[in-house]
């Protein structure tokens, strides 16, 4: 089914990923569809608010979050990603199933869901699995310091967790990436150097489209 190109960009907190994605959108223009998770479609954005902004979200365990993320992802796929790919667009998602694995399976410690995760991935994605994952790697100490220095309001309940959580998160991403086509970018570099590396990876991927 897939006519376009599907790329996921993911990272822990404070990598500068969102800034780099905005630069990509500006550089590559209208043929690039930039979306995000959780969210990316009207109903999935409502689930995003439930996941990140609900007053009681911090009380939800990994199993609850796991279900909510996959529900949002199903709607996101149907209403945003699939139509764009059918139209031959390049879709870049700011987070995707890689985050579910890193956050819920590893950092939140729900290893009992690991086999189920891969089953869910096969069931929901089928032939829609991303062509490439780009992981912005950064030491959590540096990333969290950046996040705190940026200001921009209160941290969500994931961002506000202790450093051990974020160290586990980094390990979770590395573990997931071993299973999929991926590129790693050193996000601790200066912004323009990160952009140069990111642009090079995107141009290489687009040349194969």
Give, region by region, the residue ranges found by the protein language model:
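Hydrophobic anchor at the beta1->P-loop junction of P-loop NTPases
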Residues: 7-9
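A glycine- and Lys/Arg-enriched "phosphate-lid" helix/loop adjacent to the NTP-binding pocket
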Residues: 98-171
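Walker A/P-loop
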Residues: 18
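ATP-dependent small-molecule kinase phosphotransfer cores
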Residues: 32-125
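ATP-binding Walker
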Residues: 14-15
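NTP-dependent small-molecule kinase module
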Residues: 25, 141-209
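Extreme N-terminal, non-catalytic leader segments
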Residues: 1-5
């Amino acid at each position: 089914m897939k006519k376009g190109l599907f790329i996921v960009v993911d990272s822990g907190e404070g990598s500068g990923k969102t800034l780099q994605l905005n630069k990509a959108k500006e550089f590559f223009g209208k043929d690039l569809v930039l979306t995000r998770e959780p969210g990316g479609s009207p109903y999935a954005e409502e689930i995003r608010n439930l996941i990140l902004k609900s007053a009681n979200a911090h009380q939800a365990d990994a199993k609850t979050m796991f279900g909510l993320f996959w529900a949002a992802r199903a709607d996101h796929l149907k209403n945003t990603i699939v139509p764009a790919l059918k139209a031959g667009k390049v879709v870049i998602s700011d987070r995707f199933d890689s985050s579910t694995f890193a956050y819920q399976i590893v950092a939140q410690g729900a290893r009992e869901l690991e086999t189920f995760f891969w089953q869910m991935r096969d069931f929901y994605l089928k032939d829609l699995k991303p062509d490439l994952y780009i992981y912005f790697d950064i030491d959590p100490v540096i990333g969290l310091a950046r996040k705190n220095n940026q200001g921009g309001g209160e941290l969500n309940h994931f961002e506000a967790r202790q450093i051990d959580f974020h160290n586990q998160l980094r390990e979770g991403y590395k573990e997931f990436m071993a299973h999929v086509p991926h590129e790693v970018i050193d996000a601790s570099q200066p912004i323009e150097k990160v952009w140069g590396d990111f642009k090079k990876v995107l141009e290489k991927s687009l040349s194969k489209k």
